[in-house]
A protein has these predicted regions:
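Structural motif
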Residues: 43-45, 173
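C-terminal and late-domain segments of enzyme folds
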Residues: 143-200
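Short acidic low-complexity segments
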Residues: 27-39
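Extreme N-terminal starter segment of soluble prokaryotic enzymes
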Residues: 1-4
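Pocket-forming structural segment of enzyme catalytic cores
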Residues: 86-159
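Cysteine-nucleophile active-site neighborhood
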Residues: 48-116
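Structural signature of beta-strand start/N-cap positions in the alpha/beta core
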Residues: 26, 41, 73-75, 134
Length: 200
C-alpha cells in the first residue's frame, strides 16, 4: 500500500516515515498535492507552524477535502490534525476544513505542552490493542471540534480537557505524536496502515 507523507516543512518526516514503513507501508514523501492524492493514503505530519503549512495547501482546498470526505484514508498528526479543521488562531490562512471547528491557543499557565500525558481513548479501531495510552505531546494549540462526536480521544493539560483525537470518514487526527509514543504509538500507526489497506 502506497502512503503519501506530505512535506510542508514539518520536522518529523524521517521518524514518521520509518514508523509507517515498519507497519508495512510504501512511503512517498511529496510536496505535490496531485501526487499525494494519487496514493492509497495520506499522512499529514506534525511539528511546525500553521501559517506556513496552510500556505502549502492548494489554493482550492476542495479537491483535498472532497477526496478525504469520499473515503481516502488520512492521518493528521499534531499540526496535521490542526490542518484538518477550518482555521487557527495561530496564523491567517484556512485549513482543509474537513472537520468543522477551530484551533485555538491553549489557555494554560505553561505553553507549549511538552512531554507525556494520559490519553482517554474511545472505541475507535485506530486504538485497537492499546489498553492504556500515555502519549507524547508537543503543542501550543488545541483543536475544538464544532461537532463533539468527531472527537475520539481526550487529554487533560493544566486542567484543560482537549480533544486528543478526532475522526471523520476515514480521516483521523491525533494531537499527540504516535511516532514518538513508544510501542502503543507504533501500534496506532500500524492500525492506521491496516485500516487504510482495507479500503484502498
Amino acid at each position: 500500500m502506497n502512503v503519501a507523507l506530505f512535506d510542508y516543512g514539518a520536522g518529523n518526516l524521517h521518524s514518521l516515515g520509518k514508523a509507517l514503513e515498519e507497519a508495512g507501508a510504501r512511503v512517498t514523501v511529496t510536496s505535490d498535492w496531485k501526487d499525494a492524492l494519487a496514493q492509497d493514503a495520506l499522512v499529514l505530519p506534525g511539528v511546525g507552524a500553521f501559517g506556513p503549512a496552510a500556505a502549502a495547501l492548494p489554493k482550492d482546498r476542495a479537491p483535498v477535502r472532497e477526496a478525504l470526505a469520499a473515503g481516502m484514508p488520512c492521518l493528521g498528526i499534531c499540526l496535521g490534525m490542526q490542518l484538518l479543521f477550518d482555521d487557527s488562531e495561530e496564523a491567517a490562512g484556512q485549513g482543509i476544513g474537513l472537520m468543522p471547528g477551530k484551533v485555538r491557543l491553549l489557555d494554560a499557565r505553561i505553553v507549549p505542552q511538552m512531554g507525556w500525558n494520559d490519553v482517554e481513548t474511545g472505541l475507535d479501531p485506530i486504538f485497537a490493542g492499546v489498553d492504556h495510552l500515555v502519549a507524547y505531546f508537543a503543542n501550543s494549540y488545541e483543536c475544538v471540534p464544532a461537532d463533539l462526536s468527531d472527537a475520539i480521544a481526550w487529554s487533560e493539560y493544566d486542567r484543560i480537557r482537549s480533544a486528543a483525537g478526532a475522526r471523520r470518514a476515514n480521516t483521523w487526527g491525533l494531537q499527540f505524536h504516535p511516532e514518538k509514543s513508544s510501542r502503543p504509538g507504533r501500534r496506532i500507526i500500524a492500525n492506521f496502515v491496516a485500516l487504510a489497506r482495507e479500503v484502498s
